[in-house]
Amino acid sequence: MSDPNANLPVLDTSAGEFKLHEYKLRQEGREWSILHTGTVLTLEAESKIIGERSVRLPYGVALWPSSIALAHEIATREREFVGRTVLELGAGTGLPGIVAATLGATVTQTDRDELALHLCRSNGQRNGVSSIQHRLADWTNWDEPGRYDWVIGADILYGESLHPHLRRIFDSNLAKRGRILLSDPFRSMSLRLMEALEAEVWKVSFDRWDVGEETTPRPIGVFELVPPDNI
């Protein structure tokens, strides 16, 4: 049997060349095609890719289950995204933001990795989306202007030391009546942030998606956060 990824391009990086793979997201009668360096659907795969960071494996452009879950969530909520502005943090392969853009949102994708933004652009073009803005940005030195109806991010809460920086971004870039949509595999540090926000009278709710192989699906929460002034 021929390899369906045989004719896909190779991602050339400072860490070497990485073969790209294709993932197809199907939801609500639509289909999106995303290129990535590999899927990280299980805890075992996650541990492996994190353990190989010493060889500069481009884990940011791998396809993570939280990205798939967030993209599915957005696709099921088309009316809430059409005509809206969206800021995506830690865009990676770009899947959630690309889905939002095809639904009619005006999207700005940010990442601190130029390689990720390169793949975001390529994946946008692959799906017929040319309107997305791409910006290199570091949460610890954030100067992104503008306010957005939605701030979205897939699995961006894994570094607890970065939570204060993310909180400042939420405060500075969320529009009046804006909302935040973050997907996460129920990491302990992420749940602590949710508890802290609830204690500050934020509205916190979530939908659960099971992503991965049928025998061992991984539960992912897509958390919607609304600050007190926007409730």
Positions of the model-derived regions?
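S-adenosylmethionine-dependent methyltransferases
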Residues: M1-I231
